[in-house]
Amino acid sequence: MDLILLIGIATALLIILLTLYFLQKRNAPAETKAAAQPQRGVPLRAQEGVPRRAQIARNQRNRLRANQNAPDAVAPVAAAPAAAIDPDGDEDGDENGPRVPQGAVLDEKMGAKKRAKMEAKEQKRLQREQELHDREQRKVKEAKEEAERKQQDDLDAEVERKRVEAERVVKELHERKEHEMYLKMKATFSVEEEGFEEDDADDKEADFIQYIKDNKVVLLEDLATTFKLKTQQAIERIQELQAEDTITGVIDDRGKFIYVSEAELAAVAKFIKQRGRVSIADLAESSNNLINLTPVTASEGGA
């Protein structure tokens, strides 16, 4: 009795399994066809059951490992939060938005358009970093050149300052030497000028005396004009010469000086000695014969 019951149960289970097998086999072609044709409007990863966030995190980890092996690689940026990425897969944004990590391994199943966009964005980022690096290098180079230029300018300024100082010293020495020579020459000229002045004074005095002797009767105003003197200066000069016994004569009340030579004075003295006592009238009458009042030039012309 128990054996028959067990056989019946086993048979029922076998029938159920066969039924399920045939039903599953019948539905398999439809599922395969549906899997071969992706649904429109649904992301490929969603259809394949691959989580997008997990794929991005895995790519970032791959990129970090790649940067650790590259000595010149730029320091990796922190992984962007998954919430910052558009759930629909649109990663377009400004430059401050999420960036594709350098060296990230792109999913082979990613669309060609999105792959190209991400590669272009990565290339742009690398180019920007290179530009920043070049700019920093250029700034360093310019700063170095500016420091060298300033140092050279300081050296040139110091050389110029020393040159100007040397020229100033040489100029001062030259001027001092010239001044000393000038003082020596001036002293020499002063001595010579004093000698010339004395000679000129002697010559002028001789001319003054000779003029009086030649003219015999001299109008004092004419004498002063001839020798560029004032009348009073001419009178004083005559008085000085008379005091020195250089010339002899008298100044009358008409402003004339009458010159009397030594020979004429001797003749007058002889006349008075011969006559004994002589009146002024007799002396005046005889003076025309004793004293020659004719100018020397006129007497020479008459001869």
Curated annotation (Swiss-Prot):
Describe its membrane topology: Single-pass membrane protein
- Gene Ontology terms for molecular function: ubiquitin-like protein ligase binding
Q: Which keywords annotate this record? A: Endoplasmic reticulum, Membrane, Transmembrane, Transmembrane helix, Ubl conjugation pathway
Topological domain ranges for the Lumenal compartment? 1-2
Described purpose of this protein according to its UniProt entry: Substrate adapter for ufmylation, the covalent attachment of the ubiquitin-like modifier UFM1 to substrate proteins. Required for ufmylation of Atg9; protects the nervous system during aging, possibly by stabilizing Atg9 and supporting its function.
Q: Where, in residue ranges, is this chain on the Cytoplasmic side?
A: 24-303
Specify the signal sequence span.
none
Region named Disordered: 31-53, 84-160
What's the name of the protein? DDRGK domain-containing protein 1
Q: Which PANTHER family match?
A: DDRGK DOMAIN-CONTAINING PROTEIN 1
Q: Major location, coarse class?
A: endoplasmic reticulum
Recorded GO CC terms: endoplasmic reticulum membrane
InterPro entries the record matches: DDRGK_dom-contain (IPR019153), DDRGK_domain-containing (IPR050899), WH-like_DNA-bd_sf (IPR036388), WH_DNA-bd_sf (IPR036390)
* Quaternary structure (record): Interacts with Atg9; the interaction is transient.
Gene this chain is encoded by: Ddrgk1
Question: TM spans, by residue?
Answer: 3-23
Per the UniProt record, one Pfam family is: DDRGK
Q: Where in the cell is it found?
A: Endoplasmic reticulum membrane
Q: Where is the composition biased (Basic and acidic residues)?
A: 106-160
Q: What family classification does the UniProt entry report for this protein?
A: Belongs to the DDRGK1 family.
